[in-house]
Swiss-Prot record:
SUPFAM superfamilies the UniProt entry points to: Calcium ATPase, transduction domain A (SSF81653), Calcium ATPase, transmembrane domain M (SSF81665), HAD-like (SSF56784), Metal cation-transporting ATPase, ATP-binding domain N (SSF81660)
Residue ranges, Cytoplasmic side: 1-73, 123-305, 383-920, 975-1004, 1064-1069, 1133-1202
Topological domain ranges for the Extracellular compartment: 96-99, 328-364, 941-954, 1028-1040, 1091-1107
Membrane topology: Multi-pass membrane protein
InterPro entries linked: ATPase_P-typ_cyto_dom_N (IPR023299), ATPase_P-typ_P_site (IPR018303), ATPase_P-typ_TM_dom_sf (IPR023298), ATPase_P-typ_transduc_dom_A_sf (IPR008250), HAD-like_sf (IPR036412), HAD_sf (IPR023214), P-type_ATPase_IV (IPR006539), P-type_ATPase_N (IPR032631)
Catalyzed reactions per annotation: ATP + H2O + phospholipidSide 1 = ADP + phosphate + phospholipidSide 2
Organism expressing this protein natively: Arabidopsis thaliana (Mouse-ear cress)
Protein name: Phospholipid-transporting ATPase 10
Binding-site positions, Mg(2+): 865, 869
GO biological process, one term: protein localization involved in auxin polar transport
Keyword Isomerase set for record: no
Membrane-crossing residue ranges in chain numbering: 74-95, 100-122, 306-327, 365-382, 921-940, 955-974, 1005-1027, 1041-1063, 1070-1090, 1108-1132
Lineage of origin: Eukaryota, Viridiplantae, Streptophyta, Embryophyta, Tracheophyta
Catalytic residues (UniProt): 430
PANTHER family: PHOSPHOLIPID-TRANSPORTING ATPASE 10, PROBABLE PHOSPHOLIPID-TRANSPORTING ATPASE
Length: 1202
């Protein structure tokens, strides 16, 4: 144990500091505590006291498994039999135990048992893995106070509410803890929350001064007692309301004192904490809700096909039972027996009694439903699950979607939506971190009305290209750019006027100094000094913030240390010209949030002056300037607009001196608001800070570049050529979003922009003088009018409506999404080539996604990288998360994760198309083979006067779907490629086969079913007629049921497998093995099964070796049936490919006929793949060609005088 003196000698003050006061006062009403939602009471260090035990809080054992040992079988069986097909086979299996069954119970129940068992084994394995993870977590060890001043190792699962624990460096917190003290004197600790929100930057927590001063070592806890009264368990990770009672005093608690389970202690030797929430009451577990259940369109269509097949089965059973009942009633009795005596088993009179014909018909109905159950593909669901899992593995292991820089491959987090990737109609994309890198670089700034920095952004280059000029250069700049030295991450600034200390020679040096000081002081970054090199790096809450601190350092204002109440930095002194160290006392941090759109700090400089330093969005900051602080406003606004035009992210910087009395009053109100435990505490804090952040003096503005990711314009171009619509939903300013649209080729020069915003003079006037209701009414009317004008403009343009782009801001979007207006908005948006929604909130992103999904009825894909994109990702049919620098929340909420936007091209055009094509073909073929098999059963049943006698042996029936036809279908679903990846890129319109659902339309489904019916007719009638007069016995006996059934079954196995071989576009050795292996296995099985004793093999005893194999007619019949059964497919395919080829078939001809290197032939086909769209650089080049042609036409007309 370390005593307090030793601890203070070793670690006097932390290098990691909190920005809220550790000493809290309690002067606010706390009536919520003890009321609804705030009823939790924690007896610290007394978990076993009677008062604590009466509370009966949850233990710390966490179970993430779906099943327990006791519930596995009943619960998993219930899950399986919720599927209609499985329930149907269960019912038929139960009926097979009765006299109604046409076959043995074992052969009826075995296939169902195999399918159910396979799925249950899969469920069991997945749940066992979860169980192992639970065991590993629950058995972790942590030091727990035993009540006598000693901490002993204890497993996490045994923790109780009120326990005192000691967590050491790099350990995870075992529960939600109240931070009591740490190894640092100021009771702060550094916490990594990647497991909670995915963010990699470290968070700072600080205990109360009241506990940190009392609890310095293990022995101090022997007599420690305290009572926490706080909120009940909830999902809010960022808010905690409670109080701590120590002796006679109470202290307010906030999230700043709470250490959440599954976060990790970093850069701190140890902390002491009291357990507040355990197990499933912890915030991380409260947040671990299941993502929304998503099902693909193909799956939903498949369910309808299953219901159709059920209807067909019941219809056939009904018709057959009616016919059977009529024939039974008319069956005459002669000489003590009926005319159809040969149909009646000895012990089954009731089924064939002419006196009880209606009852016989009813019994036959149940027999027929069992007999025709083979129309329903019992193994379809499990086969599709296997295929989708294997497809997901291929996606995960695709080296072309692996991002080496961050070591991140693609990750299919769910396999349910693979085929949906090939059906996407609209992509809704975030901008920052998705289209751009979210790696900010300080590139320009405006100080005292003068622009600095001459770096050229990607957007400016795109603007120059589209205007036909040279890259934009600021006319005010006449400087020499110093290109020496290595490039600094986060800093891409070029301007010698302010670099290398030259700023001191500028006329506005005093303003420049204040500007750079603000960059060095107004932030929440943490400096970390490398002990070997002495270099300082920064841990910041956002890439923007890190870029500002790095920029300040490069300008000569190096922030190098932070204490609990101070910020230290080095700067060049204006008077002496030497580097000096300055320490500003940090008094308050007014934190940034999306509502305030600004952050400020209140500091006392080394001259004793109180300063408020603030930075924020231009629309928020300009309205807060004092009358005497607007000296550079017009010029700064102009520069901000220019920066936005260049696609840069801007912030405005301002400051003011604060009067001592004003600060005292503010600080009192501010601390009281922070100490409040009322529900409106955050609103109260915002109100108080709003009053302080007024009458500011403008210094200038910053501009940072978030560059487009590599390959974004090319990816967007290819997706546009595939016919996919792309919407951008961003929180950025309209000007920034528009110019990113140009840089990414979403927009181009000739595209007409329909801009909808509320920047009209009327609205601005009302915002200054009108009431809230009046503003809302005028705003709504303005949005409606602008939407109507946009629709009229589109209507007037006629067929060229794709040349329009819709751009709408967040305020207008609020009204456009209202129930009465949203259809008008959607109609306009879907008629435009590009849509950009600016200043969008996370909720608006989700609502727009929902509107597009429900309004168009087509597949939507949302892609984003931040926590603000989670709602959008979960609302879309497919959510794609970018594993970028904003953390992992988007990835954790997504269906598929990729590292770069450009990988979306391969994910959709290649994997999406392949998965769609494979699954569609697989399901169609499944129903084809089952109809082929089932119709032969029905025809034989009709041929035998609906006697209920099956055409095939029991085991033949049972094993058809399991062993003789399923593996080739699975191989098709995993390996087939109708078109190679190279041709998917070359002919992007191929993707429209999925969007238009060409390969799984009802026309194609019915066509495959009809093909199965034709195959069954050929098999049954050819087999029946060819064997009718054939002898299969030395005694002269003709073919019986076992001979006809064996021959028909052989033909079915050959036909369905050869049909599969004909349907495959891309053969692999696996497909050869499973197709020819399935056929060979039938003969092997027939020989082995037929060689078994007659009691087991029944009528199949020696049928192959003694009857079928020696008979030439068996082999000739099989050959001719195969040919005649497949001829209709050959004829159809030939006519269809000759006169009505699908697009993938045209591309296949290019490959098969050797035209892939014939430029003219390829260009002819490729032209069909290029849609007349204005999105993408291909469209831009085409427009350039058209402009050039018009230009030359005009010159020609001028020359000839036309």
């Amino acid at each position: 144990m370390a005593g307090p003196s030793r601890r203070r000698r070793r670690l006097h003050l932390s290098k990691i500091y909190s920005y809220t006061c550790g000493k809290s006062s309690f002067q606010e009403d706390h009536s919520n505590i003890g009321g609804p939602g705030f009823s939790r009471v924690v007896y610290c260090n007394e978990p076993g006291s009677p008062a604590a035990e009466r509370r009966n809080y949850a233990g710390n054992y966490v179970r993430s498994t779906k099943y327990t040992v006791a519930s596995f079988f009943p619960k998993s069986l219930f899950e399986q039999f919720r599927r209609v097909a499985n329930f149907y086979f269960l019912v038929t299996g139960i009926l097979s135990l009765t006299d109604l069954s046409p076959y043995g119970a074992v052969s009826a129940l075995l296939p169902l048992a195999l399918v159910i068992s396979a799925t249950m084994v899969k469920e069991g394995i997945e749940d066992w893995r979860r169980k192992q993870q639970d065991i590993e977590v629950n058995n972790r060890k942590v030091k727990v106070h035993d009540g006598n001043g000693i901490f002993r190792q204890e497993e996490w699962r045994n923790l109780r509410v009120g326990d005192i624990v000691r967590v050491e460096k790099d350990e995870f917190f075992p529960a939600d803890l109240l931070l009591l003290s740490s190894s640092y004197e100021d009771s702060v600790c550094y916490v990594e929350t990647m497991n909670l929100d995915g963010e990699t930057n470290l968070k700072v927590k600080q205990g109360l001064e009241a506990t940190s001063s009392l609890l310095n070592q293990d022995s101090d806890f022997k007599d420690f007692r305290g009572v926490v009264r706080c909120e009940d368990p909830n999902v809010n990770l960022y808010v905690f309301v409670g109080t701590l009672a120590l002796e006679e005093e109470r202290f307010p608690l906030s999230i700043q004192q709470i250490l959440l389970r599954d976060s990790k202690l970093r850069n701190t030797e140890y902390v002491y904490g009291a357990v507040v929430f355990t197990g499933h009451d912890t915030k991380v577990i409260q947040n671990s809700t299941d993502p929304p259940s998503k099902r693909s369109r193909i799956e939903r269509t498949m369910d309808k096909i299953i219901y159709l097949m059920f209807g067909l089965v019941f219809l056939m059973s009904f018709v057959g039972s009616i016919i059977f009942g009529v024939e039974t009633r008319e069956d005459k009795v002669k000489n003590g027996r009926t005319e159809r005596w040969y149909l009646k088993p000895d012990d089954a009179d009731i089924f064939f009694d002419p006196e009880r014909a209606p009852m016989a018909a009813i019994y036959h109905f149940f027999t027929a439903t069992m007999l025709y159950s083979y129309f329903i593909p019992i193994s379809l669901y499990v086969s599709i699950e296997i295929v989708k899992v294997l497809q997901s593995i291929f996606i995960n292991r695709d080296i072309h979607m692996y991002y080496e820089e961050t070591d991140k491959p693609a990750q299919a987090r769910t396999s349910n939506l693979n085929e949906e990737l090939g059906m996407v109609d609209t992509i809704l994309s975030d901008k920052t971190g998705t289209l751009t890198c979210n790696s900010m670089e300080f590139i320009k700034c405006s100080i005292a009305g003068k622009a600095y920095g001459r770096g050229i952004t990607e957007v400016e280059r795109a603007m120059a290209v589209r205007s036909g000029g040279s890259p934009l250069v600021n006319e005010d700049l006449d400087v020499v750019v110093d290109q020496s030295g290595p490039k600094v991450k986060g800093f891409n600034f070029e301007d010698e006027r302010v670099m290398n200390g030259n700023w001191v020679r500028q006329p506005e040096a005093a303003v420049l100094q204040k500007f750079f000081r603000l960059l060095a002081v107004c932030h929440t970054a943490i400096p970390e000094t490398d002990e070997e090199s002495g270099n300082v790096s920064y841990e910041a809450e956002s890439p923007d913030e890190a870029a500002f601190v790095v920029a300040a350092r490069e300008f000569g204002f190096e922030f190098f240390n932070r204490t609990q109440n101070g910020i230290s930095f080095r700067e060049l002194d204006l008077v002496s010209g030497e580097k000096v160290e300055r320490v500003y006392r940090l008094l308050n941090v007014l934190e940034f949030n999306s509502t305030r759109k600004r952050m400020s700090v209140i500091v006392r400089d080394d001259d004793g002056k109180l300063l408020l330093l603030s930075k924020g969005a231009d629309n928020v900051m300009f309205e807060r300037l004092a009358k005497n602080g607007r000296q550079f406003e017009a010029k700064t606004q102009e520069h901000v607009n220019q920066y936005a035009d260049a696609g840069l992210r801007t912030l405005v910087l301002a400051y003011r001196e604060v009067d001592e009395n004003e600060y005292i009053e503010f600080n009192k109100s501010f601390n009281e608001a922070k100490a409040s435990v009322s529900e409106d505490r955050e609103a109260l804090i915002d109100e108080i800070t709003d009053k302080m952040e007024r009458d500011l003096i403008l210094l200038g503005a910053t501009a940072v570049e978030d560059k487009l990711q590599n390959g974004v314009p090319e990816c967007i171009d290819k997706l546009a050529q595939a016919g996919i619509k792309i919407w951008v939903l961003t929180g950025d300013k309209m000007e920034t979003a528009i110019n990113i649209g140009f840089a990414s080729s979403l927009l181009r020069q000739e595209m007409k922009q329909i801009i909808i915003n509320l920047e009209t003079p009327q609205i601005k006037s009302l915002e200054k003088s009108g009431g809230k209701d009046e503003i809302e009414l005028a705003s709504r009317e303005s949005v409606v009018m602008q939407l109507q004008e946009g629709k009229a403009l589109l209507a007037a343009s006629g067929a060229s409506s794709e040349a329009f782009a819709l751009i709408i801001d967040g305020k207008s979007l609020t009204y456009a999404l209202e129930d009465e207006i949203k259809k008008m908005f959607l109609d306009l948006a879907t008629s435009c080539a590009s849509v950009i929604c600016c200043r969008s909130s996370p909720k608006q992103k989700a609502l727009v996604t929902r509107l597009v999904k429900s309004g168009t009825g087509k597949t939507t894909l949302a892609i984003g990288d931040g926590a603000n994109d989670v709602g959008m990702l979960q609302e879309a049919d497919i959510g794609v998360g970018i594993s970028g620098v904003e953390g992992m929340q988007a990835v954790m909420s997504s269906d598929i994760a990729i590292a770069q936007f450009r990988y979306l091209e391969r994910l959709l055009l290649v994997h999406g198309h392949w998965c769609y094509s494979r699954i569609a073909s697989m399901i169609c073929y499944f129903f084809y083979k089952n109809i082929t098999f089932g119709v032969t059963v029905f025809l034989y049943e009709a041929y035998t006067s609906f006697s209920g006698q099956p055409a095939y042996n029991d085991w033949f029936l049972s094993l058809f779907n399991v062993f003789f036809s399923s593996l080739p279908v699975i191989a098709l679903g995993v390996f087939d490629q109708d078109v190679s990846a190279r041709f998917c890129y070359k002919f992007p319109l191929l993707y429209q086969e999925g969007v238009q659902n060409i390969l799984f339309s009802w026309k194609r489904i019915i066509g495959w079913m009809f093909n199965g019916f034709i195959s069954a007719l050929a098999i049954f009638f050819l087999c029946k007629e060819s064997l009718k007069h054939q002898l299969f016995d030395p005694d002269g006996k003709t073919a019986g049921r076992e001979i006809l059934g064996g021959t028909m079954y052989t033909c079915v196995v050959w036909v369905v497998n050869l049909q599969m071989a004909l349907s495959i576009s891309y053969f692999t050795w696996v497909q050869h093995i499973v197709i020819w292996g399935s056929i060979a296995f039938w003969y092997i099985f027939l020989m082995i099964y037929g060689a078994m004793t007659p009691s087991f093999s029944t009528d199949a005893y020696m049928v192959f070796l003694e009857a079928l194999a020696p008979a030439p007619s068996y082999w000739l019949t099989t050959l001719f049936v195969m040919i005649f059964a497949l001829i209709p497919y050959f004829v159809y395919k030939s006519v269809q490919m000759r006169f009505f080829p699908k697009y993938h078939q045209m591309i296949q001809w290019i490959r098969y006929e050797g035209h892939s290197n014939d430029p003219e032939f390829v260009e002819m086909v490729r032209q069909r793949s290029i849609r007349p769209t204005t999105v993408g650089y291909t469209a831009r080049r085409a427009a350039s060609v058209r402009r050039s042609a018009r230009f030359h036409d005009q010159i020609y007309k001028d020359l000839v005088g036309v």
